[in-house]
Design a protein with these regions (language model features):
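Core segments of cupin and vicinal oxygen chelate
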Residues: 2, 9-50
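Conserved active-site tyrosine of GNAT-family acetyltransferases
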Residues: 18-22, 84, 113
Length: 122
């Protein structure tokens, strides 16, 4: 197994609001689709690399204490974290150096109440 992550889903209660949040916070466009009758907003990715989506499924609920994923924070993690409040979320951990050249992370609560991380090598 070269990479254990293949796909992730971030639950939403309001897909339009969550899509607007992530598009603003990450400065990117998400692609809207439906899979099995469930609406989704898919993050940009290319096969065979891992991908993921925001999903609106009644059996899934946003959480701030469940599984934690880290999205790509690009070259300027501080810029991503600075956009979080205006997009409707809150930063719960500022840019933090992991040491030993591993990179940097930050944590936020999204517009739906999910705790999500961002990672950058810089």
């Amino acid at each position: 197994m070269d990479n254990p992550l293949r796909w992730f889903e971030i639950p939403t209660t309001d897909l339009d609001r969550a899509t607007a949040f992530y598009e603003a916070a990450l400065a990117t466009a998400l692609r809207r689709e439906s899979c099995g009758g469930n609406p989704m907003a898919i993050f940009p990715y290319t096969c065979p690399h891992p991908g993921g989506a925001l999903v609106a499924m009644p059996q899934l609920a946003p959480r701030d204490n469940g599984t934690l994923i880290y999205l790509d924070g690009g070259d300027d993690l501080n810029a991503v974290l600075a956009r979080i409040p205006a997009a409707g979320g809150s930063v719960v951990m500022a840019k933090t150096d992991l040491g030993k050249g591993i990179g940097h992370i930050g944590l936020f609560i999204d517009s739906e109440g999910n705790r999500v991380g961002v990672y950058s090598q810089n």
